Curated annotation (Swiss-Prot):
Gene symbol of the encoding locus: purL
EC number: 6.3.5.3
Binding-site residues, Mg(2+): D430, N472, D620
Residues annotated as catalytic: H41, H87 (proton acceptor)
Intracellular or extracellular location(s): Cytoplasm
Molecular function terms, GO-annotated: ATP binding; magnesium ion binding; phosphoribosylformylglycinamidine synthase activity
UniProt protein name: Phosphoribosylformylglycinamidine synthase subunit PurL
Substrates-to-products reaction catalysed: N(2)-formyl-N(1)-(5-phospho-beta-D-ribosyl)glycinamide + L-glutamine + ATP + H2O = 2-formamido-N(1)-(5-O-phospho-beta-D-ribosyl)acetamidine + L-glutamate + ADP + phosphate + H(+)
Record-level GO cellular component terms: cytoplasm
Pfam family, one: FGAR-AT_linker
Function: Part of the phosphoribosylformylglycinamidine synthase complex involved in the purines biosynthetic pathway. Catalyzes the ATP-dependent conversion of formylglycinamide ribonucleotide (FGAR) and glutamine to yield formylglycinamidine ribonucleotide (FGAM) and glutamate. The FGAM synthase complex is composed of three subunits. PurQ produces an ammonia molecule by converting glutamine to glutamate. PurL transfers the ammonia molecule to FGAR to form FGAM in an ATP-dependent manner.
Keywords assigned: ATP-binding, Cytoplasm, Ligase, Magnesium, Metal-binding, Nucleotide-binding, Purine biosynthesis
Sequence positions that bind substrate: S86, H87, N88, H89, R108, G211, Q231, E303, S304, Q305, S525
Organism: Thermus thermophilus (strain ATCC 27634 / DSM 579 / HB8)
Length: 725
């Protein structure tokens, strides 16, 4: 078996650990179980020790990390389950199916908590859009997300899209889902002793075998051999499974639910047993199959989609079978919990594997020594040279640049209103807002991350990601409750890669503590590199908040004659900025500094302004700086503005800095708004007034003016050309 262990990529030290835990040599089936359960994708061997440091508790938290999704209270007996998941490696090989099954998987995570999925957000990263491969991947991924989400009837209400050369070979596809549930319907992956465990949903085939292990290694140039590791999704079957599962939960028929995702039956059953402090006996001959002659290994490791395991309450077995029968789905007992804490597998009457559940679930962990990449330090410490450029032209070029142009060409492919809960449409606000029907409550959600910041300063980049996601949720009027993190990085086995992982998590910890927003779920995807080139450390942070749905703010200027104010400093920084890259073609300099105390105060202030009815228009100043944000505010309703910028230079017009928010207020209430800001000791400036069909900016160097038509034209075309070309 040692030779086989080496052949399938189990390190020598881990093989010895397996032998020690079993007290004997494993057989072939057992060795393959350890291969997938001890993969980085399932076991988090390198990240688990670091993730322990993240704050996980908060007054709204019902369920933190460790289950299929996190859950927070939002009021009136309602709760929201949410999580972000990656499907990076499959999407690099088969972008359509990789993205589609990524959506399917995260939907099942949410419904396994007893929640009805109500919204999807996607966070996507690709190489330069002028390259054919990037365009191919983008089109396939967007189509896959639309295919699954639209067909299953869950709206895609927001997301985050970035192009960067660091993702040329390794695209990132992260999907976030929110689900709504009554607090009393919350389910967990648990079972009591002697209970049957039911297999429900699609029949098992050979698709996706080895997917967990595939997601735990570096991508190679030749990808044809990886195609069998990519699963195939069926959203129509997924819809039936969702309705049947939620009906069973609502009828109080089940005590435990578990999605069947990475590592298939092996992971779902062994984890359920381990969390319950029990063992499980699985009879593979009872598993519904769609292919002939499947071996024990194939049945155990298949990652066929649209499958769940459920544990019925005593006496509810027949009722459970009837519910799934009405939806035309298989629902059969395949296993039973046992007192011995082992994962026992039988095939044709023989035991083919018997492994302690703890041995499978508790993989070895690694704490390594990290070292900053000297090239990253050199780039960060490179001084910014004097930059000369015509601001008139710079704004047009920024609006047309891949990372700042309109995302309408993407989100118009998604159904973002199915379910009739969407209270703030894509492009209308800084975060998505969904209404909880029958209440006054709304739920806001946003995903954020800036690869330039993270590449040059992993810790600060992660802090910015959480701060901006919280800021965007606050700017629509919602109080951030908790976050989910999708950590996407290269190999942790190099000192530089491990340094980036450790620093990213340290940054999240610092921002989480300062902002009072805990983590409740997440995902770690490592080995995102090719040919030794790592992706930028990418912490996709998804924040969920709660608000009174009628007191929400949009980003667009709604009417002329309102006063426009800026909270925060007028001047930004050029390091790691979009304008610096636009003018030099290079990425360097120190990312903007972040004062987390100031950040929290700014977020509280804008929420108060919205809740008091002082403003209904607010927008954060982020990538592209002040003028870019002002231009974005003119687009939704075609209302312009005239403003004065007192500071000189590109830093004032296009520099980037956190803790800045633009908002409007009626002239009669200006004093109320400014008094609120003064009481909190926050810097602010009255910039000007809304109105007209142009954006006019008075600067120390003269007057700048753009027609709204020219700005809108520059902003709308680029991404459409990429997707339609």
């Amino acid at each position: 078996m040692e030779a086989l262990a080496k052949e399938i990529g189990i390190p020598e030290g881990e093989y010895r650990e397996i032998v020690q835990r079993l007290g004997r040599e494993p057989n072939r089936v057992e060795l393959l179980l350890f291969k997938v359960m001890w993969s980085e994708h399932c076991a988090y061997k390198n990240s688990r020790p670091l993730l322990k440091a993240l704050p996980k508790e908060g007054e709204a938290v019902l369920q933190g990390p460790g289950e299929n999704a996190g859950v927070v209270r939002v009021g009136e007996g309602w709760a929201v389950a949410f999580k972000i998941e990656s499907h990076n490696h499959p999407s690099a090989v088969e972008p359509f199916q990789g993205a589609a099954t990524g959506v399917g998987g995260i939907l099942r995570d949410i419904m396994s908590m007893g929640a009805r999925p109500i919204a999807l957000l996607d966070s996507l990263r690709f190489g330069p859009p002028e390259e054919a491969r990037s365009r191919y991947l983008l089109k396939g991924v967007v189509s896959g997300i639309a295919f699954y989400g639209n067909a299953i009837g869950v709206p895609t209400v927001g997301g985050d899209l970035y192009f960067h050369e660091g993702y040329r070979e390794n695209p990132l596809v992260n999907a976030m889902c929110l689900g709504l549930l009554r607090e009393e319907h919350l389910k967990r992956s648990r079972a009591s002793l002697g209970r049957p465990i039911y297999y429900a949903g699609a029949k098992t085939g050979r698709d996706g075998i080895g997917g967990a292990a595939f997601a735990s290694r570096e991508l190679k140039e030749e990808k044809a051999e990886d195609r069998p590791a990519v699963q195939v999704g069926d959203p129509f079957l997924g819809k039936l499974l969702m309705e049947a599962t939620l009906e069973a939960i609502e009828l109080d028929l089940v005590e435990g639910v578990q999605d069947m995702g990475a590592a298939g039956l092996t992971s779902s059953l062994s984890e359920l047993a381990h969390k319950s402090g029990l063992g499980v006996e699985l009879h593979l001959d009872l598993v519904p199959t769609r292919e002939e002659g499947m071996t024990p290994e194939e049945l155990l490791l298949s990652e066929s989609q649209e499958r769940m395991v459920l544990v019925p309450k005593e006496g509810k077995e027949k009722a459970l079978e009837e519910v799934f029968g009405r939806w035309g789905l298989d629902c059969v007992p395949v296993a039973r919990t046992i007192p011995e804490r082992v994962f026992r597998v039988l095939f044709r009457g023989e035991v083919v594997a018997e492994v302690p559940t703890e041995a499978l679930a508790e993989a070895p962990t690694y704490v390594r020594v990290g070292r900053e990449d000297p090239e990253v330090r050199r780039l960060r410490e490179t001084p910014i040279p004097p930059l000369e450029a015509d601001p008139q032209e710079v704004l047009r070029r920024l609006l047309a640049s891949p990372n700042l142009a309109s995302r309408e060409a993407v989100y118009e492919r998604y159904d973002h209103q199915v379910g009739t809960r969407t209270a703030l449409l894509p492009g209308k606000g800084d975060a998505a807002v969904l209404w909880i029907k029958g209440t006054r409550l709304g739920v806001a959600a946003k995903v954020d991350q800036n690869p330039r910041y993270s590449r040059l300063h992993p810790r600060l980049g992660a802090m910015h990601a959480l701060a901006e996601a919280c800021r965007n949720v606050s700017v629509v009027g919602a109080k951030p409750l908790a976050y989910t993190d999708g950590l996407n990085l290269g190999s942790p086995e190099t000192p530089e890669g491990y340094h980036e992982l450790a620093e990213t998590i340290a940054g999240l910890k610092e921002a989480s503590e300062a902002l009072g927003v805990p983590v409740v779920s997440g995902n770690v995807s490592l080995y995102n590199e090719s040919g030794g080139k790592r992706i930028p450390p990418t912490a996709m942070v998804g924040v969920v908040g709660v608000l009174e749905v009628d007191k929400r703010a949009e980003m667009g200027f709604r009417r002329p004659g309102e006063v426009l104010l800026l909270i925060g400093e007028e001047r930004g920084e050029l390091g790691a900025s979009e304008v610096l890259y636009l003018l030099t073609g290079k990425e360097f300099g120190h990312p903007p500094r972040l004062d987390l105390g100031r950040e929290k105060a700014v977020q509280e202030a804008i929420r108060d302004l919205i809740q008091r009815g002082l403003t209904r228009t607010a927008h954060d100043v982020a990538e592209g700086g002040l003028l870019l944000a002002l231009a974005e505010m003119t687009f939704p309703y075609g209302v312009g503005a005239t403003v004065e910028v007192r500071e000189e230079g590109l830093e004032a017009l296009f520099g980037e800095a956190p803790s800045r928010v633009l908002f409007t207020v009626e002239k009669t209430r200006l004093q109320e708004a400014t008094l609120l800001l003064e009481e909190r000791g926050l810097p602010y400036r009255v910039l000007g007034e809304t109105g007209g069909k142009s954006l006019t900016v008075l600067t120390p160097g003269g007057v700048l003016e753009w027609s709204l038509e020219e700005l809108l034209s520059a902003w709308k075309a680029p991404l459409r050309e990429v997707l339609d070309g």
